[in-house]
Structure formats: C-alpha cells, structure tokens
Swiss-Prot record:
Origin species: Bartonella henselae (strain ATCC 49882 / DSM 28221 / CCUG 30454 / Houston 1) (Rochalimaea henselae)
GO CC, one annotated term: small ribosomal subunit
Source organism, top-level taxon: Bacteria
Protein name, UniProt field: Small ribosomal subunit protein bS16
HAMAP family from the UniProt entry: Ribosomal_bS16
Length: 127
C-alpha cells in the first residue's frame, strides 16, 4: 500500500481549511484516511499559526515509507522534519529561440556598421 501525507480540504465555500492526513494514495482527496497529523488554515494572516503539525506522528509515518506531496513537503521543510530537494533548471535563465535570433541579428548589424565606418574613414598620409 503506497502511503501519502497530503492535504484534505474542509471548510466552507470560499473559506478553505485543510487537514494534513496520511492516506492510501489510491483513496479520494477528501475520502478515507489512516490518521490526521496536522492542519493548515490558509485564511490566517502570515504571522499567525497557520500550520499545525504532530511532528512525532509525521516522523513515524515517514519512517513507514509515506511520501509527502509537494505542498506538505514545504511545510515539513519549514518545520525541519524533512529536507526539500532543490530544483535545478539550468535552461531557465537562457533566452528563447526568437530572442537569440534577435541578439544575433543585432550583433551582426553592429559588426557591419563598424566595418563600414572603418572603410569610409579617410586615411591620412603624412609626407
């Protein structure tokens, strides 16, 4: 049985409240779960106690092989329970194909302008 530590939505319309639960990966989002190990109230202000975790039980379930979802892993990383791996996207900062073509065209135009300028400059001969 594949275990997940994930969010289960509660609350009312436009007022979400999430329970952090341990459930079988095949069960529905708000369906059957094994244990409730925390809560997250996104409506509270930033400095309030938005996330409540039962650290002892989370450590137990992590030891049993439960895998946290991305959002829950953020909470666990902030609490120091599990390290979130850094993501690496080396091509993110590179310009796209069209931008590279524009850069190459501008560079070529600058080189041609510099070459034309040196050709048209008069050569002074000192006698």
């Amino acid at each position: 049985m594949a275990l997940k530590i994930r969010l289960s939505r509660g609350g009312s319309k436009k007022r979400p409240y999430y329970h952090i639960i341990v459930a079988d990966a095949r069960s529905p989002r708000d369906g059957r779960f094994l244990e409730r190990v925390g809560a997250w109230d996104p409506m509270l202000p930033k400095d309030g106690p938005r996330v409540k975790l039962n650290e002892e039980r989370i450590q137990y379930w992590l030891g049993q092989g439960a895998q946290p979802t991305d959002r829950v892993l953020r909470f666990l990383d902030a609490a120091g329970l599990k390290k979130r791996p850094t993501r690496n996207n080396p091509h993110k900062g590179e310009p796209g194909k069209k931008a590279q073509e524009r850069i190459a065209a501008a560079k070529q135009a600058a080189e041609e302008a510099a070459a034309a300028k040196t050709e048209s400059a008069p050569i002074s001969e000192e006698v």
